Amino acid sequence: MKRILFVLLVLALTLSACAPKQDASFGNILKVTDGTVEKTYSADDLKILGEIQASDKGVTYIGVQLKVLFQDAGIDPSTLSAVKAVASDGFTANYDPSQFLADDMLVAYARADGALAEDEGAFRIVLPDQGGKLNPRMLVEIDAIP
């Protein structure tokens, strides 16, 4: 019996050592692309671009305007027909120009009272007074569609 337990323990340790390691930065980097231009951002990078606040459902978020983020990435937001936000779990949300050019649409990296909640990830879209499906959490990529 002891021998079987020992073999199972060694097998379990071996399998756990062979498991792929998760990239520690996964989810802490935001990719912005239009298919030709691609730029990545950390929360510190976004803070440099300017800070605005927007409130949704009683929570005040801090972030950067989406159109400012596009301009920094070398993408002219006025030439886009749509924008797609992609979350780490594969969820996507699509926006038309009236939404993504709005002054209060932002990519949030914090709340006014501190960091984003753990279930929000490092970044999220905030489009005030819209349904939850247009405010994805765990944002990892923004695709600009010409």
Predicted region positions:
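Sec-dependent bacterial lipoprotein signal peptides
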Residues: 1-16
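N-terminal intrinsically disordered, low-complexity segments enriched in P/E/S/T
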Residues: 18-146
